[in-house]
Amino acid sequence: MCRTRELNGLRALMARINNWNLATQNNKVYVADNERHYLVSDLGAAFGKTEWPPSDVPRLPHATEGVLKDYEHSSLIRAVKGDSVTFEMHTTAPFFVRIFRGKYFNKYKQAQRVAQGIPVVDAQRIGALLARLTPQQIRDAFRAAGYQPAEVDGLAKVVEKRIAALIHLKE
């Protein structure tokens, strides 16, 4: 796989919003006129946490989606080593859940790799691009996605903090 700075930025973005549903059918790279276009078609499994135990979405054995309190308290960065960063991303349930849901486990076990070994410079670059968004634009995106008014400001604040964290990696 050719990992361009744009693809690495997309990987950092998916980690930043805790999008654990990184199945191939949800994320594509298209080439048109010798130019790559990156498409994410499903962000429903984002803005929660990607770790055990799930809080209030019992249908998911390992994560939550769209839960402000979980997103606020979730970790972003696992480690920065040398010139690369690994983001916190747990896409599989604990062993005692996996043994009963083998297909589910197999579907998501490789997705954790998306958040590993991203060049710091590429993560900082996507952070700088995202920093161009105004606070109003970020809040408008959450409103357009159907979040409740009480959640919009909280989610936006977490996003803004995570953008700043991307920009200031290794500082």
Language model features: what each stretch is:
Residues 35-171:
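C-terminal catalytic region of ATP-dependent kinase domains
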Residues 22-29:
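Hydrophobic residue at the +6 position relative to the catalytic HRD Asp in the kinase catalytic loop
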